[in-house]
């Protein structure tokens, strides 16, 4: 499947099509035709080669026993909930999480949202948006430590798409330089607090800097100086400017004005 969405890091806020790209009917049709011409066996080989090139980079051994490994997973889960030790199940969950991220967050696509990319409803919980107050960050905490930096690329693009609208938020709400965002986000550059919700939980000015730290983490693991020079540094510098302006001098120290991160408060 495809959509007409395109990432735009310099959006024109007067243009209703500033986030419109390809015709999804054309691209989807071409993909379906190409897939049908290859046949199932070839597609399975391509799929296996694609995900194993990432999945096979990391192994985890917690010395699980074979008897537990031979049990059906639902039974293992029930036993685990009852207090049984099953290190092998923990290994399985570790790799299951990596597989889900590999399958839901690849270059050129949108990042994993509150439901990954899967849910069983047309309108999923919380509209399956991006909650910037910990949820979207949690999706990506394991990515670089488990050697999946490529899977972070859609998240980086999501953050980059917040910078220009986030500059407006910084000026309008906080009289600050740089950029920031708030608790809820979407791929269309939505960075302001929700105007129909209470500011007691909705105003999260340090969300932008929190998101920006992921760009530094990506560089810290990859040591990709081209990324830092061409992408990461400008985003980080702008975020740092907002953070500096958000501080208040109190005697000999600087403090942050009150903020809220609802999911971890």
Language model features with spans:
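Residue-level signal for cytosolic alpha-helical hairpin/rod architecture
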Residues: 74, 136-137
């Amino acid at each position: 499947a495809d959509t007409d969405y395109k990432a735009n890091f310099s959006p024109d806020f007067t243009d209703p099509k500033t986030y419109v790209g390809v015709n999804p009917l054309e691209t989807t049709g071409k993909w379906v035709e190409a897939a049908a011409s290859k046949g199932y066996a070839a597609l399975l080989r391509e799929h296996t080669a694609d995900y194993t090139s990432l999945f096979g980079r990391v192994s985890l051994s917690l010395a699980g026993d074979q008897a537990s490994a031979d049990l059906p997973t639902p039974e293992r889960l029930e036993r685990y909930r009852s207090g049984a030790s099953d290190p092998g199940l923990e290994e399985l969950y570790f790799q299951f999480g990596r597989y889900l991220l590999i399958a839901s967050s690849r270059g050129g696509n949108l990042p994993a949202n509150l439901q990954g990319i899967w849910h069983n409803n047309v309108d999923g919980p919380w509209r399956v948006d991006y909650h910037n107050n910990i949820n979207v960050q949690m999706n990506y905490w394991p990515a670089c430590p488990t050697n999946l930096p490529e899977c972070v690329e859609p998240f980086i693009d999501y953050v980059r798409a917040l910078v220009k609208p986030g500059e407006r938020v910084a000026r309008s709400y906080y009289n600050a330089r740089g950029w920031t965002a708030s608790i809820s986000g979407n791929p269309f550059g939505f960075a302001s607090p929700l105007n129909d919700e209470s500011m007691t939980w909705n105003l999260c000015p340090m969300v932008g800097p929190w998101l920006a730290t992921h760009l530094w983490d990506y560089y810290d693991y990859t040591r990709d100086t081209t990324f830092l020079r061409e992408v990461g540094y400008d985003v980080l510098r702008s975020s740092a400017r907002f953070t500096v302006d958000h501080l208040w001098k109190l005697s000999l120290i600087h403090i942050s004005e009150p903020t809220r991160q609802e999911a971890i408060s």
